[in-house]
C-alpha cells in the first residue's frame, strides 16, 4: 500500500466527516435564511398575484403582495416567530438532506478521481462536478422528502393556523391523501433537483477553480498552499457559494413553484389567505406549468423569485463555507 493511501482517512471515517459537516452546514444555513424561505413559500402557494404591478388587471385581492409589505404583514400578524414557521420539520429535513448530499457527493467524486483527497477532486472535469451534484441531490431529496413537504405545509399558513403543529399536519395529510401523500410532488422535485443541484455544485467547483487560478497568478507564491482548497480564503468561498446559489435558483425557480403547488394541493387553507390548490388540480408537472402559465402568466411561474434569489445567494454561501470549515474541523479532530 502506498504512503498516499495510508495518509487518506478510512472510508467510513470520511463518510462520517462529510455527513456531519453537511448536517452542520445545512442547519446553520436553514436558521439564517428561514425568514426569506417563509415569504417565498407564501408567494408560491398563493394563486392570486403577488406583485403590485400584476394587480392592475386583476379582480382578485391577494393576501400577500410585495416583499416589504409581506414582511410587515407577517411580523404584525404573527410576530418574529412567524418568520421561522415550519422550522422544526425544515431542520429535520435539511440536516439529513445535506448530510446525505455531501456524503454522496464526496463518494461519487472519490470514485471518479480514484482518491478521497480534496486536492485530487479539484482536478476533476467540470462535467463530473455537475453530474456528482445532481446524483447527490437526488439521493438527498428521496431520503428527506416527507419533512420537506411538512415544512412547506406549515410555512405556508399564517394566523389563524389550520395545522397547529407538525403532528396535526402529518395526520391530516395521511388521512386526506394516504401515505403516498407524504411524497406528493416528488417527481417534479427530482426533475427540479437534477439541474438545480448539478448547477449549484458544478458552478461552485467552477468558481473555486477560477479563484484558485486567480490566487496563483496574482498572489505571492509564499502565501499559497499545497492544498488547493486551503488556498482560498473564507471570503472567496463565500463568494463562490453566493454565485452558485444565485445561478442555480434563477434557472430552476419555475419547477420549485410547481413542486410547492403539488405539496399543498387538496389541503385545508384558511379563506383569509385566498383560494387553495384543489386536489388533483394538476395532472403532472408539465400540466402544472401549463396551467400556471395560462391562468397566472409568466409572473406565476416566478412567484417568490425575489425572496428566493435573495435567500439562495446567502444560503449557498453559508452552506458551502460552513461545510468547508466544519469538514476541516472534523478532519483535524477525527483523523
Swiss-Prot record:
Its main location: mitochondrion. Disulfide bonds: none annotated. GO terms for biological process: thiamine pyrophosphate transmembrane transport. Keywords: Membrane, Mitochondrion, Mitochondrion inner membrane, Repeat, Transmembrane, Transmembrane helix, Transport. It comes from the Eukaryota. It holds the Pfam family Mito_carr. The chain crosses the membrane at residues 13-29, 88-105, 127-150, 182-199, 231-247, 304-323. Coiled coil: none annotated. It is a multi-pass membrane protein. It is found in: Mitochondrion inner membrane. Solcar repeats lie at residues 13-111, 124-210, 232-329. GO terms for molecular function: thiamine pyrophosphate transmembrane transporter activity. One of its GO terms (cellular component) is mitochondrial inner membrane. Mitochondrial transporter that mediates uptake of thiamine diphosphate (ThDP) into mitochondria. Belongs to the mitochondrial carrier (TC 2.A.29) family. This is Mitochondrial thiamine diphosphate carrier 1. It comes from Arabidopsis thaliana.
